[in-house]
A protein has these predicted regions:
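Partner-binding and oligomerization surfaces adjacent to conserved cores of proteins
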Residues: 1-212
């Protein structure tokens, strides 16, 4: 994995990131791909009899496992970066039709900047390179050597391979780093879905390596 990773942003997002010197984390349920981090990426249907103990209904067990994976998704925030800075599709999709900015970050210095207790389970984000594959072929949850938590966070369909994504993943980040985006702060909604809230990790100046 390269030391310099890139964040594609529109002008407003770039000004906020550079001006506030922070990195925005979004809830895993709020991403633009509805299959991203979804419990259905993993097959929980082949339940071993040892799990059911002769009396637990199979359907109940499957629902329990999928709900656990869904709760994991809802409790996880992540930041998407890229290994490349010259993807035309990325400039089009994430930089407001090529009118935005791509910021290069030194990932080693980013991890050195993690504020105290940013996460309540892990003290700092996990760095995961996204794996692109046929998501129709789901791993059996009970007969695999894969780390299922990691698999759920890092697996995407092959159609997204052009992004060359690396993710910073933080399960259950501390609420002291939570905030609305500037756009959200202007809204007058009476009820907010807590998953819409962003979390912001403060960065030191030396984290910013380049701007395109």
């Amino acid at each position: 994995m390269p030391r310099i990773l890139y964040k594609y942003l529109d002008i407003v997002g770039a000004k906020c990131m550079i001006g506030n010197q922070n990195l925005q984390f979004t809830n895993a349920s709020q991403l633009n791909d509805p299959f991203d981090c979804h419990p259905k990426l993993i097959d929980y249907s082949n339940v071993p009899n040892t799990k059911l103990q002769g009396w637990i209904p199979k359907e109940w067990w499957i629902e329990k496992e999928e709900n656990n994976a869904l709760n994991l998704r809802n409790d996880t925030w992540l930041c998407s970066l890229s290994k490349i800075n010259d993807s035309l599709l990325m400039w089009s999709h994430y930089c407001y039709n090529h009118k935005g900015i791509c910021i290069g970050l030194d990932i080693d210095k980013v991890l050195e900047s993690v504020p105290p207790m940013f996460g309540t389970i892990y003290l700092e984000p996990l760095v995961l390179e996204v794996q692109y594959q046929d998501i129709i072929e789901r791993p059996n949850a009970y007969h695999t050597t894969k780390d299922l938590f990691s698999y759920q966070w890092r697996t995407k369909a092959k159609e997204w391979e052009y992004e060359q994504e690396v993710r910073l993943v933080i399960p259950k980040p501390s609420p002291i780093y939570a905030a609305f985006t500037p756009q959200q702060a202007k809204l007058t909604k009476e009820i907010w879905d807590w998953r819409e809230i962003r979390h912001y990790m403060l960065l030191k100046g030396e984290c910013f390596e380049s701007i395109y």
